[in-house]
Amino acid sequence: VSQDRRTAIVTGSARGIGAAVAQRLASDGHAVAVLDLDESACAGTVDAITSAGGEALAVGANVADEASVTAAVERVASELGAPTILINNAGITRDNLLFKMSVDDWDAVMNVHLRGAFLMSRAVQKYMVDAKFGRIVNLSSTSALGNRGQANYSAAKAGMQGFTKTLAFELGKFGVTANAIAPGFIETEMTAATAERVGMSFEDFKAAAASQIPVARVGQPEDIAHTASFFASEGAGFVSGQVVYVAGGPKD
């Protein structure tokens, strides 16, 4: 499907789901700002895009810091073009049971996920409104429905869904849609670290997860990228305020 070349920003795209989304949007014909906390860590994703003939820019920014976000978005606008696709993917985990969870554990997760999505969305919306076109895709999680040891993460990921629906109401009349993707178990460095923390080999951890998933496999970053590509497309202009669980079966 041919569509206009847009400028996309994908936060947390040095690796994992974000990297897959950035590469997919580039293959869709968009210029992609590969944004992560450490600019040098973005090199792998940028190289993958440019070696495939795409256009990408590495951008180092802390999504939880207002000045950092403002500077990053202005840099993208000047070097790649006005951003009209935003994927709020940056995320961290600081898992612990409630009685062991520190205030720092809580704040760190809230800041990256929710404050980050707020600051990024607020910074790019003016470019979208000017273009009369915008696509915001927020990464939620099946953990939004509750997950032991993730009071902070599940609250943040549920918050992303409410934030998404409000953006849909506020920005719809300007040609801007906002949707959320809630991944289930996806094979990434983050889930590998979870396996290590609970004392399982990653292969056993994945097998246990797959046994509970109707399609009988764990997800890949590309599964999320496929859905993000759809939400970012021109053809998805009548889809807004939705949460899609990309989890191999029904979740909500």
Where are these regions (language model features)?
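Alpha-helical segment proximal to the catalytic Tyr-Lys
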Residues: K126, F169-K173, G237
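Active-site Tyr-X3-Lys motif and surrounding loop/helix of classical short-chain dehydrogenase/reductase
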Residues: A71-S78, N96-K100, D104-N111, Q150
